[in-house]
A protein has these predicted regions:
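Alpha-helical solenoid scaffolds in eukaryotic macromolecular assemblies
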Residues: 1-587
Length: 587
């Protein structure tokens, strides 16, 4: 929008558009701000038409383009945009908008139906209209609520007086479990009575049914007339399609259990209730159990309109699709849609999973690029930095990973407490991958002066010393090293007393289970008294000091960083709480 010197309209309207534009740029996730901007652009110059100024029309198009790039699943706004283009520039411009909209939300029954209706009114070449209906049918024909689309398709063929094509459509539809399945069957049955036998069923089926009728009459020595034979064949055909109806009825009833619980079948920026997510999970479970690939895919696509901001369903879709043969590109497209449109970078898990997928497919440079793209937005994200370093380790060896850590530790863009966590992973690589305990220990010793306030640093160092293998002869020496880590942590770190006590519990466990000598329990009791005794004997026992003087405490914001716990995104996967109620947060 900044490319335009004027937005069209009066000075007052220009001022309002500038203000609304600023609000959108300040908070691009605000749906309300976007709606206000689009409405203001629509009302420029008293309402836009083909006689409006080029500036006003450009402003309108720019606002819609940006809005629908941000929220591409808003089928109603695609329809409004197409209507506006039709009024402003005619059918070709409107058709371009419909094409963009249907590419953005491929499974919208409403949008495809509107597009087909538009095509019916503006195109008089029958095969072009039918081609569009068939395209639409591949995307929305299986939808449980697809009846408006099929009604529109039948309406078009009625206008063409193409009874054979109406019959063919109905013959398809009666096999689809959907909300209004029964009325399609009734119409199909009535129409089939007026169609030639050769148009009702395939030639091989017709031959089989004729043979059955003749075989049934043969034992009685009866030779039926052609009219009688046709009557009996039609009765068999009617029974055959009644079986189809009953199957469709049964399949519809099964799905109604889940369909009836869907309260919001369209996209919106607000959260859903836990009960809605639970229903989608159960519905997907059902279709996967049924095993029809097309129906499963269609349901996932429906689900990911309603649940677009819930990354659990993107993960699920990608995992399911990856279990199907020869679906690498389809899986890639699922990840691309998730990361480019719906899941914010502040929740990097789906992006990391995408990177792992690309690495597994041999596209290592793409996997590296995904990590780098996340880090441009989240330079302090420990999980992503560690993931990137381990990607380099897998592809380039241990030194490549350590160089990656060193580069991040040296970067001014990385927070002090993030660096502390990275140092611990550097040490762990030396210990567990290279097998060098002394090099790993030196990393802790050489960095303690910088990261003494980091919980993650002390946790890692303490675990490192606790996990060293020992013998009866070396346990005492090992115990001294552990004791020194505990004493250093208590006296040098400005972490909260609660966090220090949490780490000291590890030492109490060690003393009880592996402590050596008569003084092990004395150390246990001394530490227990200082941790849990009354204030008269425990006061200031966990206060950091320098030259005997207490050090100042960390402010609250710094303390939260210093004492942060770090996790991998995949540690949070698990069964959803079936008892959860209320609104389900996106994250």
């Amino acid at each position: 929008m900044s490319d335009f010197q004027t937005y069209g309209g009066s000075d007052e309207e220009n001022l309002e558009i500038r203000k609304l534009n600023s609000e959108v740029e300040a908070d691009p996730d605000s749906f309300e701000a976007w709606e206000k901007l689009v409405r203001a652009c629509e009302s420029l110059e008293g309402g836009l038409n083909r006689n409006s100024s080029p500036q006003a029309l450009a402003t309108l198009r720019d606002s819609y383009d940006r809005f629908l790039l941000k929220f591409p699943l808003l089928f109603g706004y695609w329809k409004k945009y197409a209507d506006l283009e039709f009024n402003i520039s005619g059918p070709e411009s409107a058709e371009m908008v419909y094409e963009r909209g249907c590419a953005s939300i491929t499974n919208s029954v409403d949008l495809w139906t509107d597009y087909c209706s538009f095509k019916m009114e503006t195109t008089h070449v029958a095969h072009l209209v039918r081609d569009l209906f068939e395209r639409a049918a591949t995307y929305v024909g299986l939808d449980f609520l697809a009846h408006p689309f099929w009604d529109k398709y039948i309406e078009y063929e009625e206008r063409q007086e193409a009874q054979d094509k109406i019959y063919a459509i109905l013959k398809r539809v009666i096999n689809i479990p959907m909300h209004q399945y029964a009325r399609y069957y009734e119409r199909f049955r009535a129409l089939s009575h007026t169609q030639p036998l050769t148009d009702i069923v395939e030639p091989e089926v017709l031959s089989r049914l004729r043979a059955e009728v003749e075989a049934e009459a043969a034992p009685f020595g009866v030779v039926k007339s052609e009219l009688e034979t046709e009557r009996d064949v039609r009765a068999k055909i009617d029974a055959m399609f009644y079986d189809v109806f009953q199957t469709t009825q049964s399949e519809t009833t099964k799905r109604w259990t889940y369909e009836s619980e869907i309260k919001r079948p369209y996209f919106h920026v607000t959260e859903l209730d836990h009960s809605q997510l639970a229903n989608w999970r159960k519905y997907l479970d059902f279709e996967e159990e049924e095993g029809n690939l097309a129906r499963i895919t269609a349901l996932y696509e429906r689900c990911l309109v309603t649940c677009a901001f819930y990354d659990e369903f993107w993960f699920r879709y990608a995992r399911w699709m990856s279990s199907q043969p020869n679906k690498e590109e389809e899986v890639r497209n699922i990840y691309l849609r998730a990361v480019t449109l719906f899941v914010p970078v502040s929740r990097p898990g789906i992006r990391l999973q995408f990177a792992y997928f690309e690495e597994a497919c041999g596209r290592v440079e793409t996997a590296q690029a995904i990590h780098e793209a996340i880090l441009t937005k989240l330079p302090d994200c420990v999980e992503v930095i560690i993931s990137a370093a381990n990607l380099r380790r897998r592809q380039g060896g241990l030194d490549a990973a350590i160089d990656s850590y060193k580069a991040q530790i040296a970067s001014p863009a990385v927070d002090l407490y993030t660096k502390a966590a990275l140092v611990t992973h550097w040490a762990v690589l030396l210990w567990k991958v290279k097998g060098s305990v002394e090099e790993a220990r030196n990393v802790y010793l050489n960095n303690v002066e910088w990261y003494a306030d980091s919980r993650e640093f002390w946790r890692s160092w303490l675990d490192f010393e606790l996990e060293q293998p020992t013998t009866t002869e070396s346990e005492a020496e090992n115990g001294e090293r552990i004791s020194k880590v505990i004493n250093e942590m208590r006296t040098r770190s400005r972490m909260s007393t609660a966090t220090k006590k949490e780490l000291c519990v590890k030492y109490l466990n060690y003393l009880q289970q592996r402590g050596v000598g008569k003084d092990a329990m004395k150390k246990f009791l001394d530490l227990d008294r200082e941790m849990n005794g009354p204030a008269s004997v425990s006061k200031d026992r966990f206060t950091a000091k320098e030259n005997g003087q207490p050090l100042g405490e960390l402010d609250e914001a710094t303390r939260l960083k210093a004492e942060a716990h770090y996790f991998n995104f995949f540690e949070f996967f698990g069964e959803a709480d079936p008892k959860a109620t209320g609104v389900a947060e996106f994250h």
